[in-house]
Swiss-Prot record:
Belongs to the insulin family. Residues 34-133 form a propeptide. Disulfide bonds join 10-147, 22-160, 146-151. Expressed in the endometrium during pregnancy and in mammary gland during lactation. The keyword Secreted applies. Relaxin is an ovarian hormone that acts with estrogen to produce dilatation of the birth canal in many mammals. It bears mature young, and allows separation of the pelvic bones. The lineage of its organism: Eukaryota, Metazoa, Chordata, Craniata, Vertebrata. Signal peptide: none annotated. This is Prorelaxin. GO terms for molecular function: hormone activity. The keyword Nucleotidyltransferase does not apply. It is found in: Secreted.
Amino acid sequence: GFLDKVIKVCGRDLVRIKIDICGKILLGDMTTGQEKQRILGSGQSAEIMPSSINKEVDSLNMLESIANLPEELRAMLPEKQPSSPQLQQYVPALKNSNVAVKELNKIIRGRQEEAEDNSHSLLKDFNLNIYSPKKRQLDMTVSEKCCQVGCTRRFIANSC
């Protein structure tokens, strides 16, 4: 079929085909969920985390951070997320409060570290850690094979 046809492509053409194939798989244009699982094989998860879920997770993390702020700081937060000029008006109030700047820095750093830890675990859970050496090595293998001997679209789809 379409996915099993051997193609020999290099450079930009390979990148275009990979974007096309991966885009179709990720957006669901090419197949249904069961077919995605069959194409990608049982070793990889075919479930995709939509960006709307990412936004909800970010909002939830922000709300949890706000909930854990000292009452004095929470009282200064506006109803909606402030823009940069709006934040500037709170700087004098923070400096005059009895909350030490060092304490505030500790709270902020702790929240940032927690957020980074959570984001890495989410990426691992969804097999989306695109920065891993294994993923980079796999991509290099795909380009070498497709350019030198040819490969199937299914082989390219497995690297998405």
